[in-house]
Every structure is written in C-alpha cells, then in structure tokens.
Amino acid sequence: LLVAGDGRAALRLGAGLHLPERPTPGLLAFLRARRPGALLSLAVHGRRGLFRGRALRADAVLISPIFATQSHPGARPLGPHGWAWLARNAGRPAVALGGVDGRSQGRVPAQAAGVAAVGWLGG
C-alpha cells in the first residue's frame, strides 16, 4: 500500500509513500526518519523526474501518463515507446500509470514492473 503525498497518513497505516515529481523535501525526511526502509515511489513525467528518482533513491517510479487519461485531461500521453525509453533509463522498477484500463493494458511495454490506475478496477 502506498499513500499519495501524506507522510503522516503513511506512518499511521504502516504504508509506503508516493510523492509527486516535485516532492516536498521535508516530507521525505519525515518518512525516512520515522520509518526507515519504507517503500518510496515517485511520479515521473519526463527526464527531470528520472534525475529526481535517482537523487531520492526511490524504490520505484510511476511513469505517466502512458495513455490519455481522464484524471489529467490536458496531459500529453507518452505512448508505449516514450514510456519505455523513460523506464529503460530509470534505474529502478517502473510502473505504468495513466489511461491504463482493460482495453489498453495489453499495450503496456513488457518491461513494466506493474500498472497502477486511478479509476480502473478491472472493468
């Protein structure tokens, strides 16, 4: 279980933490100090995010959006090839996020460590 952006909630739940691409440094320090070894993931939307993921020593990156998504209607999709390039250069497990549903999941590159979804629950 990963909690998005709320270190205190992550601690209460004994969960890991998912940070936006531009995380709050104090939040990361809070989580690391209180719960060493807690799973940390970082949102990545482009090359800059890859550098941040390395600097933060994130356990995994959620690269998005791979496809058009209703949760971020103005975001330009990376597409499978753009997503795969970022994943190859991430240096850590990469999870596909954004527009993943029953129709698109088969187009997610095989190197994905997994898929994540905001609105899709398998239907």
Task: Show the residue positions of the predicted features.
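A short, structure-level motif marking secondary-structure boundaries and short turns
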Residues: R34-P36, A68-T69, N89-A90
